């Protein structure tokens, strides 16, 4: 395991949208605090976004970093200028592991500490790239990424089960109340 800086293993992507196609459109409102997967976006083309991103890249909400908004993109699209697009240097870090480096309390604490501005603090890539963390070799990265994504899948399945149970209870309660009133 070796200590590395984020900028040694990942880079900020500054790609401009070419205007072709019907991209997914991501604003800060689509990044859910604590969620590592981007699950919603817009297709409304009435916006001024020009920053392009691609499937597998990490979208980091650089404005108000204390909100802990960062997620891996499941599709290609365009995003707000208040989102930093981060891509793994694949010979240094597995793209599947990078989202977990970004979506963690230590990284967010670092980002908040480097943010500037009072009403709407923002953090720059020039500061984020200096974030240091321990990184294992590629074989261990593969094992770790696999394990972490299994945890994410299990957590999401559990949350879905809770939601379905809530809906079932609501439907039973509604049925009993309306059925009993007739």
Residue ranges and their predicted role:
Residues 25, 60, 122:
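Short aromatic/basic micro-patch
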Residues 63, 77-84, 117-139:
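A short glycine-rich beta-alpha junction/loop motif
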Residues 7-55:
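Sequence-specific dsDNA recognition surfaces
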Residues 50, 58-103:
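A short beta-sheet element
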Residues 1-17, 130-146, 150-182:
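Non-catalytic DNA-recognition/assembly elements of restriction-modification systems
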